[in-house]
């Protein structure tokens, strides 16, 4: 068997491969996390934004995000209108290359209730 690699001069990302070896994660969750880690650090994450760049539908994306939450790779914090400049509900995504335990004082959202 041969693996044909390209020379990495541009359009590549360096990330930990820990999540790729994590047997708790499905390939769907591994792929989504890899995609999210490949985006710029200041990217404005949203379910609708992820759907726009994927073949998967909303249910599939939410399923993968819930899996990442369950295993500590993602935390989503809901900000209420009185906490934001836009005066609208906003969501803050904290994405981890390595699993991160949920802090007791942080509320981790269940994505079934998100728009």
Task: Label each region the model flagged.
Residues 1-10:
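N-terminal leader segment of winged-helix/HTH proteins
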Residues 19-31, 36-93:
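Winged helix-turn-helix DNA-binding recognition segment
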Residues 94-115:
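Charged low-complexity intrinsically disordered patches
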């Amino acid at each position: 068997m041969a693996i044909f690699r390209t020379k990495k001069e541009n359009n590549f990302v360096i990330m930990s491969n820990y999540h790729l070896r994590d047997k708790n994660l499905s390939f769907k969750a591994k792929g989504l996390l890899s995609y999210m880690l490949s985006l710029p650090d200041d990217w404005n994450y949203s379910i609708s934004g992820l759907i726009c760049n994927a073949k998967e539908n909303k249910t599939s994306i939410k399923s993968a995000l819930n899996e990442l939450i369950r295993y500590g790779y993602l935390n989503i914090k809901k900000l209420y209108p009185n906490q934001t400049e836009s005066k609208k509900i906003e969501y803050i995504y904290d994405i981890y290359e390595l699993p991160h335990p949920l802090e007791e004082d942080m509320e981790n959202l269940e994505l079934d209730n998100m728009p």
